[in-house]
Amino acid sequence: MIVVGIAAYLLVNNSGSKSGCPLCGTPVSQSFLQKLSQVANNNTLANKVGSGLAVSGPYANLPKPINGTPLTLNGEPQIIYVGGDFCPYCAVSRWGLVIAMMRFGNFTNLSYMESSPTDVYADTPTFTFTNSTYHSNIVSFVGFELVNRDDNGNVTNPGFTTHYQNIYSTYSSGGIPFVDFENKSVLNGATVTPQILAGSDWNQILANITNSDTLQAQGVIGEADIFTAYICKDNQALNMTAAACRQSYVKAIIG
């Protein structure tokens, strides 16, 4: 399990972090989002990959059950992500999380991002949840980036309220990435290594993850399948309404 330590709740607006990365902070193109959504909802691909490297890889790490108060927003089960733009382990996790959430809804104002140019696995291509909005009739999602790409930001993000800070402080190990699945399970750290994305840009990754035999598909689709399974886990309403929850890989992962 890989966890990047955070010493304080430093909340940052990342949209201006373009040093060495012209695309960073700019909206993901509609054509790219459409293609990514097609990958996300390719059930044949998802079932073929299953959990992939998220279980068999060197950094295999699964969500752990907790006994929290059920987490909902407007009556919908809620998923919370906490990370930072500089963090390479958050970078690889965002690929899987975006794909998983696209199986239940869609994003607007999702932007391109790269991890820090000075950290390990420098400049890992990814996305940022800053200023993005998630739309779904059956699931709620909110993503917070605590620190910008240069690891020097200090702009307060008002969305990370005391409510979310308390959830993070209670159930996280103090690091990022952190994902809370409806307060039923939480994931501390990444499920796969960012190394699988090394040397590729966004379009190359998108092309590679369509082929179940590639290392990037085994990692990205594998983690997306893990995230999807834990969104569906122990949720009767979702299992009745969401096609993703009825896929064979979900049953294989959560039993």
Describe the residue ranges of each PLM region:
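Non-globular targeting/processing and membrane-anchoring segments
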Residues: 1-78, 92-94, 99-255
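Short pre-active-site segment immediately N-terminal to redox-active cysteine/selenocysteine motifs
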Residues: 83-86
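Cell wall/extracellular polymer interaction/catalysis modules
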Residues: 89
